[in-house]
Curated annotation (Swiss-Prot):
Ion transport in keyword set: no
SUPFAM superfamilies: Aminoacid dehydrogenase-like, N-terminal domain (SSF53223), NAD(P)-binding Rossmann-fold domains (SSF51735)
BP term (GO), one: methionine biosynthetic process
Protein name per UniProt: Bifunctional protein FolD
Role summary: Catalyzes the oxidation of 5,10-methylenetetrahydrofolate to 5,10-methenyltetrahydrofolate and then the hydrolysis of 5,10-methenyltetrahydrofolate to 10-formyltetrahydrofolate.
A Pfam family of this chain: THF_DHG_CYH_C
Superkingdom per UniProt: Bacteria
Quaternary structure (record): Homodimer.
The family this protein is said to belong to: Belongs to the tetrahydrofolate dehydrogenase/cyclohydrolase family.
InterPro entries listed in its UniProt record: Aminoacid_DH-like_N_sf, NAD(P)-bd_dom_sf, THF_DH/CycHdrlase, THF_DH/CycHdrlase_cat_dom, THF_DH/CycHdrlase_NAD-bd_dom
Lineage, highest ranks first: Bacteria, Bacillati, Chloroflexota, Chloroflexia, Chloroflexales
Annotated binding of NADP(+), by residue: 166-168, 191, 232
Amino acid sequence: MSARILDGRVLAQALRHELAAQIAELRERIDRAPVIAVVQVGEDPAATRYVRSIDRLSQSLGAACRTIILPDVVTQAELEATVSRLSADDRVDGILLQLPLPAGLSLDGVLSRLIPEKDLDGIHPINAGLLAQGRPALIPNTPAGGMELLRRYEIEVRGKRAAVVGRSAIVGRPMALLLLQADATVTICHSRTSDLGAVLRECDIIVAAAGRPQLITAEMIKPGATIIDFGTNVLADGSMVGDVDFAAAVEVAGAITPVPGGTGPVTNVMLIQNLIKATRSRLGI
């Protein structure tokens, strides 16, 4: 029997309707559109496409987007000065840094100039610390989207055993913390985990965030388990696959996100949700 498909496109569409209504209400309260500022260094085509998609999404929901494109040769001081100006600008409600930064630029230095109240990626040390303490403010968008998929599709988390494969500061670790705060028993797996399959076969929920195409095979999956696949791996033929062997896993799992069309569409919408949170919190409304 095939697994239930956790369709991120369908969920994202429902969320867009909800967020558009919230932004309309917010605009009435503050007499303007909430503004997101996106800082991009260089003009990498993939990064540019992503930034344009954020611009289109923002405008479609009634928010405004300002894109600041800095040259590849920008210095650390110039980049930090740009972020400082945006942090101090009362007309900007949230800031998104297009990552990763080019080699030679320090993310830590840039984050030191970003006020946590405007950190739409949820990666500022203060926001990371609040999440670790169980007092989340602005949460990284990708794991927030994963939790939203679990919630909206009514996947039980409390009391379940969950494994997160991947320990990045932006996806793996925050996802593990969110699952822990939802009362799951969580194991974090990584490149040094011995016998990954033995760990995963004990788990009711598997979160794949390793960045390795089709790392997780059907033999590693407990029958009926729920799989959230954050992997976005482009193969030599141009096709995109996740970190899970979807074609085989769909015959074993109870529920699974496809790639593409699973976690990706929800991630971008979570960015707008963070913009609304940031605006309300900063303006005290």
